[in-house]
Curated annotation (Swiss-Prot):
InterPro entries: Big_2, Invasin/intimin_cell_adhesion. It comes from Bacillus anthracis. Residues 44-115 form the BIG2 domain. To B.cereus BC1230. This is Uncharacterized protein BA_1245/GBAA_1245/BAS1153. Pfam families: Big_2 (PF02368). Disulfide bonds: none annotated.
Amino acid sequence: MLAAFQQQQTRKFSPITNTSASCLNIQPNPPKISIAPSVISVIGVHMEKNKLKVRTGQSTELSASVLPMQATNKELIWTNMNADVITLYPKGDTVTITGKSAGRAVVIVTTAEGKFRDLCIIHVQPYMTNPK
């Protein structure tokens, strides 16, 4: 940009009456200045819970936060490590977890760049009805 300012075109003209100017500085296209936004890198991801209980047939939500809060790319990837036990329904920084069958599963959240991850262990308990 500085070079564009230094290379301004100067042209010599005949003197203009009633003035003492003999040079005019003409800029047919003024330089365009743009400021690119800075990229704020991700330094981590944190899930709100590291253990969670849910009953079969019931749902609960789990959320995660990208650190710092001002990070440029806050995209998260949710992974279910045991699809027989739970089902995931991700939506941005939140995932809905539905218990399918009794057992344990692990939910992993990973930043879009893949550098940071966190996990939560899900315990699915059988749905119990009131005994007679």
